[in-house]
A protein has these predicted regions:
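Generic alpha-helix detector with strongest preference for long hydrophobic helices that associate
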Residues: 8, 35, 47, 54, ...
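Conserved aromatic-histidine-acidic binding/catalytic patches
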Residues: 109, 113, 146, 202, ...
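Helicase-primase coupling helices
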Residues: 147-234
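N-proximal short alpha-helices
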Residues: 39, 87-90, 94, 98, ...
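Active-site phosphate/pyrophosphate-binding segments
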Residues: 3-172, 177-180, 265-301
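C-terminal helical cap and adjacent loop that interface with cofactors, partners, or active-site loops
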Residues: 214-277
Length: 301
């Protein structure tokens, strides 16, 4: 406003709930163009509504191709035939894994361009499945802890734990057949066998070979793992991948008989924060916090 004055609202677009929340009040007051979030869609499931599509479009991403990928994955996953429904098949396998004590899920893409998928997956999987009670009101303490890794970087750190540590993990390898660029490995040091054997190959082949080698090592050690392969990292494939994981999460929550779409544990922390700041309407929560047992000084260093 300091620079643009009354024209400032022409440079801001709001994405918000249509009826409630502070942002819709501000958007109406300031006259911001507004896109609305559909009712009942949580942030972690919002990639295919304006929350995800608007910033993607602004960045020049072809959102029509993303939606086509999601649509095709949806069609593929409508069958009751488990062998032909990838999201349902993956959910069944993961459910069996959880039932047998594999309570950690590692997301390990072998492409830098997919590394942020792991961050989103961690929120999606943890916030959706980490629930203390099921639909019957029974205490179940459900969930599987998501961990992010990056190939090949974390082969030299985390994979040691995955191959020789506790049998409590499922490792998901994200592979790419065709990278956006080909990086040649030049010839040189022909007299050094430990270097020369790579000459004339490509970094593309090296990355995928290391992924296959890691997959082999995990399997040889009896560690549960699965591989998901994208033909390339493009809008269509990402649309398929994002939709797959959202549906995979929904199926998994149904198998656990829990509410996949709420986050009461997160809300409790928000309420406590509001109370600590003295927000109106949270006086009872403030009293609860004030009456809670204090930290014992002898345990504070």
């Amino acid at each position: 406003k300091q620079k643009l004055g009354d024209k400032a609202n022409q440079h801001i677009i709001a994405t918000t709930d249509q009826n409630k929340g502070n942002l819709i009040k501000i958007a109406k007051q300031e006259g911001f163009p507004t896109f609305y979030i559909p009712d009942g869609v949580g942030g972690r499931f919002s990639e295919f509504c304006p929350v995800g599509l608007l910033p993607a479009a602004v960045l020049g991403i072809d959102i029509k191709l993303m939606l086509q990928g999601a649509k095709d994955m949806d069609q593929m996953c409508r069958t009751d035939d488990i062998s032909k429904n990838p999201a349902l098949f993956a959910s069944l396998l993961m459910h069996v894994a959880m039932e047998t004590g594999h309570n950690i899920s590692v997301m390990m893409p072998y492409a830098d361009s997919l590394r942020l998928i792991s961050d989103w997956y961690c929120q999606l999987w943890a916030e959706s499945l980490g629930k203390s009670v099921d639909y019957d009101g029974k205490l179940v303490y459900a969930g599987q802890t998501p961990v992010k890794a990056l190939g090949v970087t974390d082969q030299h750190s985390q994979v040691q734990l995955y191959t020789e540590g506790p049998f409590d993990k499922v490792i998901i390898l994200l592979a790419v057949n065709n990278f956006r660029a080909t990086v040649d490995i030049p010839h040189g040091f022909a007299d050094i066998p430990d270097v020369n054997f790579l000459c004339g190959s490509t970094m593309n082949k090296l990355i995928n070979t290391e992924m296959e080698a890691t997959e082999y090592a995990l399997t040889k050690a009896g560690r549960l793992n699965m591989r998901i392969t994208l033909d390339s990292v493009d809008e269509y494939s990402l649309g398929q991948l994002l939709y797959f994981f959202m549906l995979h999460t929904a199926y998994s929550g149904a198998m656990l008989n829990i509410n996949t779409y709420n986050q009461p544990g997160v809300e409790e922390g928000k309420k406590a924060t509001y109370a600590m700041f003295g927000k109106q309407g949270y006086e009872a929560k403030k009293q609860e916090l004030d009456s809670a047992p204090k930290k014992d000084q002898k345990y504070i260093i």
